[in-house]
């Protein structure tokens, strides 16, 4: 009897323990479910995973050799296909700091043309390894510096001769002889010409961001400054002889000079701005300004007006140095005009055959 009660008591105890364990498990499950639901709600709505696009980037290895000795200077690696020659020059400058980018000339072949900075590596590469030849271009200066030096020099040099500073002319002769009115007019026209050049260089022309060698700067300055000194010396000399036909010759040539200067300015304004279509490659077209109607006759009216200015200045002053300078400038500008005219013919052949390069119906 005692054993039976003992067994019943033990069974009763097991039943209570199992019920308590079940309740504790249920409580734990409820807590876990509540925590899981709160976590899902805080995570927000499920987003569909987008497919990851794997773009294969091609890298090039640029081997740079000396153009004279063919010795390897450096290797520029990890160059992408969209990188330009200018980017290669920048990396080359980091490897060789003594050569800054504007001084570096890169060629595909020895003696070949220098690669332009805007060319991409993909356009010149035949394989993943590209060999380029390096040439030191020497000391470089910007084109803006070249133009400012070319035009500032003649402006100041002419004024020095016009003021008849000492040690240029005989002081006694200079004080005795008065300047002819054409001398003052010539100084005015000469100053207007080069002041216009300077202002257009700073505010009108879209000067290239490229560079040129210091030798080219010295050559250009020697040409312009030297001829200006020669011209100014003769025109401002105390023994200067006025034009043969007097004031009528001076007045007509001066008016024509000012007309050509105005026309040159308006043409440069048209050339510096894109066309109404927004395409810089389009042939520049005339507008409502009568000075721009010269585009109907010639491809390069800016050279036409420039030569017209110097011919007028030659007639107005009637001096040999101005005539020689005008002749040389005419030859040079005719070569530039023919070259540009050929480019226009290739691009706009149906429209350009009826035009001349610089002089209407002649050249």
UniProtKB/Swiss-Prot annotation:
Region forming the signal peptide: none
Main location (coarse class): membrane
Spans through the membrane: 143-163, 216-235, 250-270, 311-331
One cellular component term from this protein's GO annotations in UniProt: membrane
Catalytic activity, EC: 1.3.1.-
One GO term of the biological process aspect: very long-chain fatty acid biosynthetic process
Topology of the protein relative to the lipid bilayer: Multi-pass membrane protein
Database matches in InterPro entries: 3-oxo-5_a-steroid_4-DH_C, SRD5A/TECR, TECR-like_N, TECRL_Ubl
Disulfide bonds: none
Alphabetical keyword list: Endoplasmic reticulum, Membrane, Oxidoreductase, Phosphoprotein, Transmembrane, Transmembrane helix
CDD domains: Ubl_TECRL (cd17125)
Positions of modified residues (Phosphoserine): 37
Taxonomic superkingdom: Eukaryota
Localization (cell): Membrane; Endoplasmic reticulum
GO MF assignments: oxidoreductase activity; oxidoreductase activity, acting on the CH-CH group of donors
Family: Belongs to the steroid 5-alpha reductase family.
Full protein name: Trans-2,3-enoyl-CoA reductase-like
Organism: Bos taurus (Bovine)
Record gene name: TECRL
